Amino acid sequence: MSMAYEEYMRQLVVPMRRELTGAGFEELTTAEEVENFMEKAEGTTLVVVNSVCGCAAGLARPAATQAVLQNDKTPDNTVTVFAGQDKEATAKMREYFTGQEPSSPSMALLKGKEVVHFIPRHEIEGHDMEEIMKNLTAAFDAHC
C-alpha cells in the first residue's frame, strides 16, 4: 500500500477512535498492549472491536458508549481495538474470545479473561441502537 493511502486511513479513523476514547475507553493499539492489559485485568471488561463500517458508526459505538454512560451497573474496564487498523492488537484480543468467530464490529464482556457475553456483527447490523443497548445493559446487570 502507498504511504499516502495509509496516512489517509489513519486520519480517516481519528474521529471513529475518539468516539470511544472520549467516553473513557482505553485504546489498545498493539499486541503487547493487549497482552499487558489482559495480564492485569481484574473484574469485568467491555471490549469493543471497532470498525470503519456504517453499523459501527451508527450503532455499535453509540450503543456501547451510551450503555456505559447510562447504566447503573457497568464494567470495571472499557477497552477497544480497531479491526483493519491495528491488526496485531485485534488478532491478539480475538485470541481471548474463545469459541467466537472474528467479527467487526463486535463487543465482548469479559470476567477476568473469560467471555461471558458476546455481541457479533449480525446482532448489531439490522438492529436499532436501543436494542443493542438493552443487550449490553442486560449483560452488565447480570455480570457487573
Curated annotation (Swiss-Prot):
GO molecular function, one term: oxidoreductase activity
Domain of life: Bacteria
Expression induction: Expression is up-regulated by cumene hydroperoxide (CHP).
Keywords carried by this UniProt record: Disulfide bond, Oxidoreductase, Redox-active center
Keyword Protein biosynthesis among record annotations: no
Swiss-Prot/TrEMBL GO biological process terms: cell redox homeostasis; response to hydroperoxide; response to oxidative stress
Post-translational modification: N-terminal Cys of the CXC active site motif can react with bacillithiol (BSH) to form mixed disulfides. S-bacillithiolation protects Cys residues against overoxidation by acting as a redox switch in response to oxidative stress.
Keyword Magnesium among record annotations: no
Disulfide-bond pairs as recorded: 53-55
Residue ranges that the Swiss-Prot or TrEMBL entry lists as coiled coil: none
Active site: 53, 55
Pfam family, one: Disulph_isomer
Gene3D superfamilies: 6.10.250.2150, Glutaredoxin
Chain positions with S-bacillithiol cysteine disulfide modification: 53
Gene deletion effect: Mild sensitivity to cumene hydroperoxide (CHP) as indicated by growth inhibition assay. No effect on growth after NaOCl treatment.
Motif placement: CXC active site motif: 53-55
Family: Belongs to the bacilliredoxin family.
Purpose: S-bacillithiolation is the formation of mixed disulfide bonds between protein thiols and the general thiol reductant bacillithiol (BSH) under oxidative stress. BSH is an equivalent of glutathione (GSH) in Firmicutes. This protein is a dithiol bacilliredoxin, which debacillithiolates (removes BSH) the S-bacillithiolated OhrR (OhrR-SSB) in vitro and in vivo NaOCl-generated S-bacillithiolated MetE (MetE-SSB). Involved in maintaining redox homeostasis in response to disulfide stress conditions. Has a redox potential of -130 mV. Displays weak protein disulfide isomerase activity in vitro.
Name of the molecule in the record: Bacilliredoxin BrxA
Organism: Bacillus subtilis (strain 168)
Gene (UniProt): brxA
